[in-house]
Amino acid sequence: MGQEKLYIEKELSWLSFNERVLQEAADKSNPLIERMRFLGIYSNNLDEFYKVRFAELKRRIIISEEQGSNSHSRHLLGKIQSRVLKADQEFDGLYNELLLEMARNQIFLINERQLSVNQQNWLRHYFKQYLRQHITPILINPDTDLVQFLKDDYTYLAVEIIRGDTIRYALLEIPSDKVPRFVNLPPEAPRRRKPMILLDNILRYCLDDIFKGFFDYDALNAYSMKMTRDAEYDLVHEMEASLMELMSSSLKQRLTAEPVRFVYQRDMPNALVEVLREKLTISRYDSIVPGGRYHNFKDFINFPNVGKANLVNKPLPRLRHIWFDKAQFRNGFDAIRERDVLLYYPYHTFEHVLELLRQASFDPSVLAIKINIYRVAKDSRIIDSMIHAAHNGKKVTVVVELQARFDEEANIHWAKRLTEAGVHVIFSAPGLKIHAKLFLISRKENGEVVRYAHIGTGNFNEKTARLYTDYSLLTADARITNEVRRVFNFIENPYRPVTFDYLMVSPQNSRRLLYEMVDREIANAQQGLPSGITLKLNNLVDKGLVDRLYAASSSGVPVNLLVRGMCSLIPNLEGISDNIRAISIVDRYLEHDRVYIFENGGDKKVYLSSADWMTRNIDYRIEVATPLLDPRLKQRVLDIIDILFSDTVKARYIDKELSNRYVPRGNRRKVRAQLAIYDYIKSLEQPE
């Protein structure tokens, strides 16, 4: 069998994942406004795809052509563009369908041509009061450098200023970062109707207010467009320059990085399209997409709650972990010292972690706090706690990952603020991104230092903890806390040798240990012992690990995969992956936690990890996976995994055809895993 048939290209697999998101927008069992929000998620995902995956492919094509190599990448480019075009057509159809369904529910997203006289007057006042100060036209002249001026993934209106036979062009930025994208209009009869208008259409309606008095014209026509840039960096790590200075420079470079996608309104005149293409230096390798009237659908993620309560998801109140509320514990440290605690977001509240760090910031017994941050919330209480701890005389070390894609600017801000507060801030070594989710609190108890550790699968972020599924393990077990201490030492001194007996740490030992554990399952299967591998991942694309799973399947090891995003492995290939079952779940929460389970001859090993099975995570990042040593917590994770694999509502097969077929229910009971997990955890947190 040829090599190309053993793996799905990661770019196509990623697009298949985003098509699953689009399926959620099409799913009529989802509430109407949630379906509209899934359109926003799809659009946001696609923007990131072009910034990262597509841009990387474009670079590969340019390099391969310079070297005179084969055309595989160009062929893949064609497949991508074809698949995106098909999905975009489905997207447009779904959007129109949802608009009709909204109207049936008395929610009207109207355009500038559908305004009543009263609404027209109201809009002109709104424009002058809230919007005009944010609008400055960019005139397109022969020397205008649009690549320099235009912002990445912002929607613009390209305006024709027509005077007789002369046409001038200008661009208007739609300032959705300063003014709400959705604006509620005064209702008309009947009063139950809820009219809204997009910011784009307010600008269309108010073109005269923008240009009148400055230009003579017979007509003004506006067409939407946006441009997506390559999000990668070209960092040259000079010894005398700090990483923060380099990152600030690279952020400036991103503002002028090469465009990789140009999306424009389908009825934009050809002459204007050509002017924009030329000004944006769009090459034959870039994606040029004629689209609808609106771009930046990512704002639809925040489509407002309007109308009846059943148009949005029924709330699932976040649950407190009952162990922290027991009367005998004076604080969170007492509870964790008694036994390990496992939190599973967003079912559990993130408040427990925030509260523990708040307590640590002023507890007289706390000596030191170490934490690494990758993506934190905009108004991060964790950052506040670290600053308060430093003010209270604690020794605070914060490892800031300046290379967290799309969060670099925020992390530079946090690093400066922490440094000013007296916190010891350190950065990752060049080329070694820190993706682990750790903190370590050192506390003086009865004359000895006791350490408390957090190992997680997700970021210390209050916002995403309400949307992403992730685990937090809180432990005072010295077997784990001593090794977390070693991880922080490794971060500060990445080239000193370090060993671990319990933790799986990239790039130190992850690949070796994963290979060894898969090989052990193969040996057990061959000897007739219990064997099996179950993985829950965001992405599975490392060919070495995929090949190891193929070898396991060929040896009779049952392999169960739950992969949300990219999966290069192809299940059910005869003689290669017959024993591999792979599914994906897309639902109201984003499945983000990573779990590795090995049967281990009947004594299961269960790991929680920050690392996907991607080459970068295994070999080029600092990642941490922890074993669950407490049998109670191990069983809890196994129960949750069982629920996920029993899903008969939101589970899809991963297959060679990228079909996204739903797993058939057959005669099994209806199980929507995320709701079932909520009920399971709720049952565990009942008072005894």
Swiss-Prot record:
Q: Where is the active site?
A: 435
What's the chief localization of this chain?
Answer: membrane
Gene3D superfamilies, A to Z: Endonuclease Chain A, Polyphosphate kinase middle domain, Polyphosphate kinase N-terminal domain
* Membrane-spanning intervals of the chain: none
**InterPro entries, per the entry:** PLipase_D/transphosphatidylase, PP_kinase, PP_kinase_C_1, PP_kinase_middle, PP_kinase_middle_dom_sf, PPK_C_dom2, PPK_N_dom, PPK_N_dom_sf
Sorted UniProt keywords: ATP-binding, Cell membrane, Kinase, Magnesium, Membrane, Metal-binding, Nucleotide-binding, Phosphoprotein, Transferase
The UniProt catalytic activity note for this protein reads: [phosphate](n) + ATP = [phosphate](n+1) + ADP
* Membrane topology annotation: Peripheral membrane protein
For this protein, the record's HAMAP family field holds: Polyphosphate_kinase
Q: How does it assemble?
A: Homotetramer. Dimer of dimers. The diverse functions of this enzyme involve different subunit organizations and conformations.
What's this protein's name? Answer: Polyphosphate kinase
- Please give the organism: Escherichia coli (strain K12)
- The protein's gene is named ppk
